[in-house]
Amino acid sequence: MMLRRILLALVITALFSGAEFAKGGVSARGAQVDLTPGKFEYYALALSWQPAFCEGHREKKECVSQTEERYDAKNLALHGLWPNKRGDRQHKYAYCGVGKKTKNLDKPDSWCRMPKLKLTDETAENLPIYMPGYASCLQNHEWYKHGTCSGLKANDYFAAACTIDSKIADSSFGKFISNNIGNAVSSDSLLDEFEKDYGAGSRKFINLFCDRADGKALLSEVRIYLKKKLPGNGILNGSFALPDKSERGNCPDSFIIDKAGFSEN
């Protein structure tokens, strides 16, 4: 009789645990992650330097079609805008309210089969410019994995991201990158430009990421950390947030701002 009670208790516990697991993910420490939209601490705005990205992804549509004159060959381009929780090192805060069928489609070869997003004509026109990965339906992956946790509608989410990207392109920081295409620059010089725009000490709100090609370090991504309330005008002053301690860039002291076109192997 006692054994039956113990077994019954174990079954009930397993059922309740399964139900709770369905509501959330698991953090790096095994704790439950609440997947309620809007329950996060800050955004990571991931901006890609597309020429360097394309060195390692030459088969992608957006890389095959890239030209030196296109926006993403001369400016940081939108990769993603990720709602983040502190301590969530494995980024389990994702797919908020997304069904299993849609989640199972979240693979590069099936992104274009994910449910179509509701965007205004203006956003639908701008997004392919600022997010070149639109050619591979990256916007679907970014929305269903990350955007659904923002608490925003898809159109507002992408419109805000595009506006911010355009403002960064026009900043001293953005122009420094554009003016040094093909050149080697130092991390400090780039971060100094960021502080010219956003104030002394603002470099603590940004991380630089590099890839290697032909033994050379190439700037591949910039991540800027923002408060939950995004600036409607895209101007970032006063909108920064400190990232989780696990967020660290990997660029060396100096690196190259790659130009469009593939380097010879």
Where are the predicted features?
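Bacterial N-terminal signal peptides that target proteins for export
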Residues: M1-L7
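C-terminal, well-folded lobe of enzymatic/effector domains
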Residues: K23-S27, L119-N265
